[in-house]
């Protein structure tokens, strides 16, 4: 591997962190509010509009089809992304994804904590048969030897299962049910100091790394500049299974160390879990739950309304018939009068013609 290539990877790694990671409050430096826990094992199918109590679109516009949620770049300055409103404190994230094809375009799955621990899957759009794995701890990007490269056939046209298995002892990346990489706590950067170990939310999205203004190493890593004439570039998220290994309603940092031992799991019912397990009821479900007496009342009320409408219609029909008969009688009288006038006119005309043996005006 050439030095130039390693430097390119290093620069790209830094850019990836900059482009994909941010935090609204860093508990390494300040006291932050607790994170909402997921606290359960659940599956999300992305073929309809997202529930904004669970998922937050952080940039751009997403579209939803029978196949899944689409993250699409159609022009410059676009990077559609979303993230979960919940956090998991160790667990499993099983994502079924098709990457976006196109030089310069990066598709990504990111688990990230408030103190910038990070676990990544990334696809560079020019290579549709490879996915990259990576990790960071506390935002540290001093080294560039953390990445892994894994073969995946037809990653842009076929859905594959990319699973992250994460505990305090080890981190595993799985592809279609086969283990691709293992990182232990002890083998991570800093002998565990920079091992991802604090509660993370989940982020999905695509972004253009191959754009003018980015470092040359970043552009080369991404496969060159983006050719927007070949747009759209689309990543598709079909479904996600998330298993939070802790139960509770919130995760709280008790100090500024960023260690997993410092995280307090606050007992209680997760509001996110409640939203998932008890979604708003449909009209049919609400109707099914009504007692028999209430249903009878609804039927009677509906019957009364129907009867009133029918009576109104009958009254209107009768009134219209009476009105029609009156109008018909008036028309008959008018017709008879006009016929009498015409008969008189014809008689006068004939009398004039017979008397004068020719045509004469009739007054």
Curated annotation (Swiss-Prot):
Keywords of the record: Cell membrane, Cell wall, Cell wall biogenesis/degradation, Disulfide bond, Glycoprotein, Glycosidase, Glycosyltransferase, GPI-anchor, Hydrolase, Lipoprotein, Membrane, Secreted, Signal, Transferase, Transmembrane, Transmembrane helix
Example GO BP: carbohydrate metabolic process
Disulphide bridges: 25-32
Modification after translation, per record: The GPI-like anchor contains a phosphoceramide lipid group. The anchor position has not been determined.
Domain of life per record: Eukaryota
GO molecular-function terms, A-Z: hydrolase activity, hydrolyzing O-glycosyl compounds
Stated name of the protein: Crh-like protein 3
Gene source species: Aspergillus fumigatus (strain ATCC MYA-4609 / CBS 101355 / FGSC A1100 / Af293) (Neosartorya fumigata)
Organism phylogeny: Eukaryota, Fungi, Dikarya, Ascomycota, Pezizomycotina
Recorded name of the encoding gene: crh3
């Amino acid at each position: 591997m050439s030095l130039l290539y390693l430097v390119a990877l290093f620069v790209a790694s830094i850019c990836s962190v900059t482009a994909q990671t941010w935090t609204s409050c860093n508990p390494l430096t300040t006291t932050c509010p607790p994170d909402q826990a997921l606290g359960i094992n659940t599956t999300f199918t992305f073929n309809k509009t997202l529930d904004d109590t669970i998922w937050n679109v952080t940039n751009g516009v997403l579209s939803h089809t029978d196949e899944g949620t689409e993250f699409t770049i159609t022009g410059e300055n676009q990077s559609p992304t979303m993230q979960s409103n919940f956090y998991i404190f160790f667990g499993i994230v099983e994502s079924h994804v098709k990457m976006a094809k196109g030089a310069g375009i990066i598709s990504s799955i990111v688990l990230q904590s408030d103190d910038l621990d990070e676990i990544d899957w990334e696809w560079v759009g020019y290579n549709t048969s490879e996915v990259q794995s990576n990790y960071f701890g506390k935002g540290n990007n001093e080294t560039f030897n953390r990445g892994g490269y894994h073969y995946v056939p037809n990653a842009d046209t076929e859905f594959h299962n990319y699973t992250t298995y994460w505990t305090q002892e080890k981190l595993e990346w799985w592809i279609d049910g086969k283990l691709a990489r293992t990182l232990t706590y002890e083998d991570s950067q800093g002998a565990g100091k920079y091992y991802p170990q604090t509660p993370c939310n989940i982020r999905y999205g695509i972004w253009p790394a191959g754009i003018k203004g980015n470092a040359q190493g970043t552009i080369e890593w991404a496969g060159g500049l983006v050719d927007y004439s070949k747009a759209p570039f689309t990543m598709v998220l079909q479904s996600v299974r998330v298993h939070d290994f802790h139960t509770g309603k919130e995760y709280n940092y008790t100090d500024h160390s960023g260690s997993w031992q410092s995280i307090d799991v606050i007992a209680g019912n997760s509001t996110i879990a409640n939203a998932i397990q008890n979604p708003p009821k449909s009209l049919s479900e609400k109707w099914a739950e009504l007692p028999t007496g209430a249903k009878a009342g609804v039927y009677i009320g509906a019957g009364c309304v129907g009867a009133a409408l029918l009576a109104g219609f009958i009254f209107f029909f009768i009134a219209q018939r009476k009105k029609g008969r009156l109008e018909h009688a008036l028309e008959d009288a008018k017709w008879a009068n006009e016929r009498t006038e015409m008969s008189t006119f014809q008689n006068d005309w004939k009398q004039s013609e017979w008397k004068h043996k020719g045509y004469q005006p009739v007054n």
